[in-house]
Design a protein with these regions (language model features):
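Short Lys/Arg-rich basic patches
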Residues: 1-25, 38, 76-85, 92-107
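Intrinsically disordered, low-complexity regions of eukaryotic proteins
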Residues: 13-14, 29, 52
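N-terminal low-complexity, intrinsically disordered patches enriched in charged
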Residues: 32, 51, 76-77, 88
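Charge-rich, solvent-exposed alpha-helical interaction surfaces
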Residues: 33, 70-73, 89, 93
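Short, basic amphipathic alpha-helical segments that act as recognition/interaction helices
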Residues: 41-68
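Short interaction-prone segments
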Residues: 65-81
């Protein structure tokens, strides 16, 4: 796979990176909010996830107040009625069994 160039926002120099295709499972409503936010920001879902991750790694908030208001609207639209407090508490129902998704343990 050929490396893709990404422009850094701090100093406008380019940083050559190699991106890979991944397959991940996410909570459905959260994914809808993320896709809606990426569309609103006119960036790809991958770029959004990279930005969120880089900010989280440095204990920085990735969004300004206006974007947080948009996120709240998208959460309402898509019925995402939980927040960070739900982290590691998701239970996935699959063919009649419950699986603790947050920690990968079976219940």
């Amino acid at each position: 796979m050929a490396p893709q160039e990404a422009t850094t926002h701090q100093d406008e120099r380019t940083l050559t990176v190699e991106r890979v295709q991944i397959g991940v499972r996410m909570e459905k409503r959260m994914l809808k909010v993320l896709k809606g936010l990426a569309e609103y920001l006119d960036i790809t879902l991958g770029d959004l996830l990279e930005g969120i991750t880089l900010h989280a790694f440095e204990s920085q908030t990735p969004f300004n107040e206006e974007t947080r208001r948009r996120i709240a609207q998208l959460k309402d639209v898509y019925g995402m009625d939980y927040g960070a407090e739900a982290s590691h508490r998701f239970v996935e129902l699959t063919t009649g069994t419950a699986k603790d998704v947050g920690r990968g343990e079976n219940r």
